[in-house]
Amino acid sequence: MDQFLITGSSRIAGEVTISGAKNAALPLLAAMILAETPTTLHNVPSLQDVRTLIELIGGMGIKIQKQGDTVTCDTKSIDNFYAPYDLVKTMRASILVLGPLLARFGEAEVSLPGGCAIGSRPVDQHLKAFEAMGASITVENGYVIAQAPKGGKLLGCKFSFDMVTVGGTENVIMAAALAKGTTVLGNCALEPEVVDLANMLVAMGAKISGIGTATMTIEGVERLHGCEYSVVPDRIETGSYLAGALMTHGDVLTKNTSALLLTPVLEKFEDMGAIITTGDDWIRAQMKGRPKAVDIRTQPHPGFPTDMQAQVMAIACLADGTSTFIENIFENRYMHVPELNRLGASIQVDGHTAVVKGVECFTAAPVMATDLRASMSLVMAAATAEGESLIDRIYHIDRGYEHVEDKLRALGVNIERINSND
């Protein structure tokens, strides 16, 4: 199993090119199943989750291949509508094939998902919506077995999600695109990745209004065609590398990104004392002193994203003063706290609240990554610590950060990937 060996006390500075967003690429890949003609997707990151979903789609007999950052897909040869546990167990986004399969082919058998262990994140909202569209849903032996109503077409309906759900919104708008009639969805997620998916569906011939709002109206069409589309830049990767500048009196320029995707995070960075400058496709963060304490409350978009909570907490560990974090999205999303404390942080957790008392510096220690975003907070913390830190279970970081060692080295981090079996 791979580990990172990081020799700390680095100043994080330099330029880094941001990849396509994993959280956008995965639903876009699933949406390719809806198209009757070939689809080409650009700016697709080379990540384990992406490779897993491509393998899953290919296992259905679909011709799908990746060259560089481009994926092409032709669904003409599909011969089954099955998503096996062996693949789905590693990645929650696999459930996103359910809507496209059900809408286009009238049936699907998809294993219940896996992925990061940061709360239950149930798929019940997906299933309730499909049932409202006339589907028959049963769960047997860990698999969701879905069947469209008589005639093979889902039926448009009016449905409001009980809670804001990104995956649920994505799954249902894909299904509604080919449903018979009009679907009105309420309490939709507003995340940029949802907007990106809706825009691609429109490019494929879907009729969707209200994109980027809490209520979307989807008028079902008979068929969707392929298109050529590019994945939106990864706002979380952007924020993660900019965070390194705030921790180390650094200066980081992120390219191929958009400040419009990261407004709530950039505002908090400025509150912490960073100098933020932006252009059409770049963001620069400069830090000249010690970070200031800040209060963070995670919220659905356009609020502060839960996927940046761990990275900003790592900054707050070095801040002058006491910061308070309230996690409103997922339970169990403070699993990085004991590991940051091992590196010398002073954090106490009570339920959904974490209180962070700033310390002068981190100290090197062996730590263990617990989930995708937590792993990046540990990498950045270790990069600032005096001495050598060993980070275990880094397969988590490989799920969400493309070419992470190369990008970190370009920013001055002394990092080496080693195999613990060596």
Curated annotation (Swiss-Prot):
Keywords, comma-separated and alphabetical: Cell cycle, Cell division, Cell shape, Cell wall biogenesis/degradation, Cytoplasm, Peptidoglycan synthesis, Pyruvate, Transferase
GO molecular function, one term: UDP-N-acetylglucosamine 1-carboxyvinyltransferase activity
Main location: cytoplasm
GO BP annotations listed: cell division; cell wall organization; peptidoglycan biosynthetic process; regulation of cell shape; UDP-N-acetylgalactosamine biosynthetic process
One CC-aspect GO term: cytoplasm
Annotated catalytic residues: C116
Localization terms from the record: Cytoplasm
Reactions mediated catalytically: phosphoenolpyruvate + UDP-N-acetyl-alpha-D-glucosamine = UDP-N-acetyl-3-O-(1-carboxyvinyl)-alpha-D-glucosamine + phosphate
Modified residues (2-(S-cysteinyl)pyruvic acid O-phosphothioketal): C116
Pathway participation: Cell wall biogenesis; peptidoglycan biosynthesis
UniProt family annotation: Belongs to the EPSP synthase family. MurA subfamily.
Name of the protein in its database record: UDP-N-acetylglucosamine 1-carboxyvinyltransferase
Organism: Psychrobacter cryohalolentis (strain ATCC BAA-1226 / DSM 17306 / VKM B-2378 / K5)
